[in-house]
């Protein structure tokens, strides 16, 4: 037996145990078992072409060599994906801990209290940041969440709208393009007409059941949507807002200016970009939609001894109960990512989140001031972290110099581009950006130091957040690594995971991902790659996808 092969380490039964099991059920071999259980018309006649098996050691050498092909440049593309700083205590104790990553969907509350509390933290985070009364425990990503919200609005139309066959969903042309594509795909099969355009010129007719806007929009501009919301409400149309979660530490939350549903991604809360995933989409809405909303909802109850306990609430929406009539499928919840995002908020607390958001905004302010001195025109009157610019020279000139300095911007057209700042950006990074932009227009730039970072918000008063958030005890207790580590362990031991026992439920998710397979996930050659990076920077990802 090859002791280091994946097969011998990853598949539990030994050869003699396999033979004993086969004898018990009356078949001579695994091939015979497959032939008897798989219909002949769908059974492959030849083995899959998957190449020669590797040992775990050989695989790690192979994947390391492959990873080196990717180019991990400093990326300021934005578009819903931003570099973050994952706290080491979360990486070590959740992401790389089988006590968290092997646990099964918490149908059985009595062996899931740890994860249920972690997911409740996530729900609380989302409800607090958006100021919506109800949030679920995550979806796949922002685009999926937006499409689910559209469908929820469609199913929740008033009787009058249903009678009139209202089927139009208005979508601002300023939402992220990947979100729009998913919305169009999901709308097609439901005969929903997606109308894309300038939200300020939308006509709310009796056929319009809902509308969607982005906050801040895909170009980075922070807009006042109050008049738009008034028009929609007058027509009894429902409002969907796709919001940047980190920006809501500084901006007035959508729940305070009329949103019926708020969606987005929690990726900014400590999750790596990872070429676009996995992330955890969030979904928050008014209580009117609680029986129509998708995703798991964690609720507080009491156990048989009268003590506080947690369970999944409103499960009658789910596929395991309603089957084909279900309004929710919780399989695509990205629960581990939601847990990590929630714990990012627990670890930093309100003060930490506010500090991170403010620092991002202040660095963007510096960039905004300096680029205009170099002759670039900046379009966004108000912004959080993204600037959209018109260049005095063609963007291919800027791109050439930027690539020489291993920097990626978002190039929109031949003379327009955008830059998004994130949690990992430093004043040194701002200097590097400005030196690229100065060189492109044949000017010089004198480097700035940390004293240039200001404290003033360049956001109008009516768009600044006034309400408090994350005041709950859980977000104001575990701010040292020791406290956080103990809290995570306390939750972990309340659960039953594959590192302790077999889980008494069967599912497609019951397969253990080997440590060797998961090990490269956090390598920067994979974790820091933007999904819209140039293709010549991601050959390793493209090879993996092709294979």
Q: What positions do the PLM features span?
A:
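Charged, compositionally biased N-terminal leader segments and the immediate start
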Residues: 1-13, 17-21
């Amino acid at each position: 037996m090859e002791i280091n092969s994946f097969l011998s380490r990853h598949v539990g039964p030994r050869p003699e145990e396999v033979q004993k099991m086969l004898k018990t059920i009356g078949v001579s071999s695994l091939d015979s078992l497959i032939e008897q259980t798989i219909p002949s018309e769908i059974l492959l006649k030849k083995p899959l072409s998957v190449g020669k098996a590797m040992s775990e050691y050989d695989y790690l050498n192979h994947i390391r060599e492959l990873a080196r092909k990717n180019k991990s440049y400093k990326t300021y593309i934005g578009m819903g994906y931003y570099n973050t700083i994952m706290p080491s205590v979360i990486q070590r104790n959740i992401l790389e801990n089988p006590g968290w990553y092997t646990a099964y969907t918490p149908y059985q509350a009595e062996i899931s209290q740890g994860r249920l509390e972690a997911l409740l933290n996530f729900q609380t985070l989302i409800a607090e940041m958006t100021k919506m009364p109800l949030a679920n425990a995550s979806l796949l990503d922002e685009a999926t969440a937006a499409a689910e919200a559209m469908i929820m609005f469609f199913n929740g139309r008033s009787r009058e709208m249903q009678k009139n066959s209202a089927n139009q969903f208005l979508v601002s042309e300023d939402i992220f393009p990947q979100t729009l594509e998913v919305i169009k795909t999901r709308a097609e099969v439901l005969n929903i007409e997606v109308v894309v355009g300038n939200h300020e010129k939308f006509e709310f007719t009796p056929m319009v059941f809902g509308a969607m806007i982005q906050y801040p929009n895909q170009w980075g501009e922070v807009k006042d949507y109050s008049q738009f919301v008034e028009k929609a409400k007058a027509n009894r149309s429902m409002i969907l807002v796709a919001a940047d979660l980190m920006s809501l530490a500084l901006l007035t939350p959508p729940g305070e200016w009329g949103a019926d549903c708020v969606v987005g991604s929690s990726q900014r809360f400590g999750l790596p970009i990872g070429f676009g995933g996995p992330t955890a989409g969030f979904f928050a809405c008014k209580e009117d939609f609680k029986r129509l909303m998708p995703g798991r909802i964690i609720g507080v109850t009491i156990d048989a001894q009268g003590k506080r306990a947690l369970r999944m609430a409103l499960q009658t929406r789910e596929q395991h109960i309603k089957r084909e009539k279900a309004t929710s499928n919780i399989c695509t919840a990205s629960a581990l990512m939601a847990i990590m995002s929630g714990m990012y908020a627990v670890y930093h607390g309100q003060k930490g989140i506010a500090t991170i958001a403010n620092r991002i905004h202040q660095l963007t302010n510096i960039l905004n001031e300096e680029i205009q001195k170099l002759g670039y025109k900046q379009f966004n009157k108000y912004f959080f972290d993204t600037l959209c610019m018109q260049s005095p020279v063609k963007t291919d000139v800027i791109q050439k110099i930027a690539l020489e300095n291993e920097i990626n911007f978002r190039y929109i057209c031949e003379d327009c581009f955008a830059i998004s700042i994130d949690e990992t950006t430093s004043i040194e990074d701002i200097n590097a950006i400005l030196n690229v932009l100065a060189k492109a227009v044949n000017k010089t730039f004198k480097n700035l130091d940390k004293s240039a970072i200001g404290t003033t918000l360049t956001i109008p008063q009516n768009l600044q957040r006034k309400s408090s958030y994350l005041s709950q005890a859980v977000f104001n207790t575990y701010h040292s690594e020791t406290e956080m580590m103990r809290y995570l362990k306390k939750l972990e031991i309340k659960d039953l995971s594959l590192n302790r026992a077999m889980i008494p439920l069967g599912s497609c998710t019951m397969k253990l991902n080997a440590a060797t397979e998961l090990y490269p996930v956090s390598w920067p050659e994979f974790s820091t790659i933007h999904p819209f990076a140039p293709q010549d920077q991601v050959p390793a990802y493209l090879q993996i996808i092709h294979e």
